[in-house]
Amino acid sequence: MDRWQGIQHVVVVGLGITGLSVVNYLRKYHPSVTVQVIDTREIPPGQEQLSSDVALHRGGWNLEWLLNADLVVTNPGIALATPEIQQVLAAGIPVVGDIELFAWHVDTPVIAITGSNGKSTVTDLSGVLANAAGVKAAVGGNIGVPALDLISPDVELYVLELSSFQLETTSSLKLKAAAFLNLSEDHMDRYQGMGDYRQAKLRIFDHAETAVVNADDTQTFPDHAAHLQVVTFGVEQAAQFSLAQHQGREYLFARDEAVMACAELSLVGRHNVTNVLTVLALLDSAGVNFRLALDALKSYTGLTHRCQVVADNHGIKWVNDSKATNVASTLAALSGLKIEGQLYLLVGGVGKGADFTPLAPVLATLPVQLCCFGVDGHQFMPLHPSARFYDSMESIIRSIRPQLKSGDMVLLSPACASFDQFKNFMARGDIFAQLARQYA
């Protein structure tokens, strides 16, 4: 079936790296199609890289363009409930995202990962281990490189991180294996409630051969599994990929076979043990022999901006967990901590309508000073008696620096999005790392 039959005019909504990847893909693989771009921002990121022969409408919507399109490709940051997109749908014009275009194009095996937390680590590690096992893997999607920019005849396995936003506009992505890691409150400014958010995530299983799900979080299980093989991972409940005692030590197990001791992992924190089990389950389901890649697994230290030690001077650790953009992510970071002295926890930013109170009982058990900043930083103030509000991340670090001593830890794990004061979570983490090195 030729999906492109009758499509002569495509409107791309939202530029940035994803929008640019769509434009570049269309020009390379469908050069006869007319492409127009709409971006409601006055200065869209990426406009300087846009070819001069592609028409760009900035600073608002252009309904005439939209309603004359044969296909609209929308950025995942734009909700389908947006009135202009609703008008397009009402006119019978298909609205898809970049992942759907990728699905139309690719025949090579694909595995994909979604969930509230841990997606990027699982995606990255899956790619690292697949390549170490001799399978040429390309990694991207919601992490790093947009999916359409990955397309190459050399690739033997695509590994995609998919957000709930991307899944909303994806309907035909065939997957060898799909993992749903966990579900916790996030993006409540976009969804009606947790049920809606979960349903968006579950779309990952629509055309998957194997569903890789979390035995410790039954919300990750598909509602309708008739067409699926289901494989489980977990550390609390019985699962096919799990932990068990072996030769007096805790081991990772794959289908009743000991793989390696947890102590041999370089990754820090209990949540990362779960992430590793997920990767083993995914690769096994996709036919990749992960046993050929155990050296790579042992040496893997994780992603930038995810519980990353950026400075360690005079016994004071500075840890960048800027990728913690929701409460569950910050809770995961706190659960794996080993602190000898005082913890200085930096929280705040754009809260996305989240409930921060689940942090309170955990903070009560820690020797913590809570340092709050950002547009929603005030919402953290009632969570702990030590809480103080600051104008900026730099003002926090200037203020606490004189009292830091050996054994202390300064942890940026904000539980919020970054776009009140920073371009993105990477920029936030980079600035924290610079400040850490400056003041350490």
Curated annotation (Swiss-Prot):
Pfam families: Mur_ligase_C (PF02875), Mur_ligase_M (PF08245), MurD-like_N (PF21799). One of its GO terms (cellular component) is cytoplasm. Pathway: Cell wall biogenesis; peptidoglycan biosynthesis. One of its GO terms (molecular function) is ATP binding. It catalyses: UDP-N-acetyl-alpha-D-muramoyl-L-alanine + D-glutamate + ATP = UDP-N-acetyl-alpha-D-muramoyl-L-alanyl-D-glutamate + ADP + phosphate + H(+). It is an enzyme of class 6 (ligase). Keywords: ATP-binding, Cell cycle, Cell division, Cell shape, Cell wall biogenesis/degradation, Cytoplasm, Ligase, Nucleotide-binding, Peptidoglycan synthesis. Its EC number is 6.3.2.9. It comes from the Bacteria. One of its GO terms (biological process) is cell wall organization. ATP binds at G115, S116, N117, G118, K119, S120, T121. It is found in: Cytoplasm. Cell wall formation. Catalyzes the addition of glutamate to the nucleotide precursor UDP-N-acetylmuramoyl-L-alanine (UMA). Belongs to the MurCDEF family. This is UDP-N-acetylmuramoylalanine--D-glutamate ligase. It comes from Vibrio cholerae serotype O1 (strain ATCC 39541 / Classical Ogawa 395 / O395).
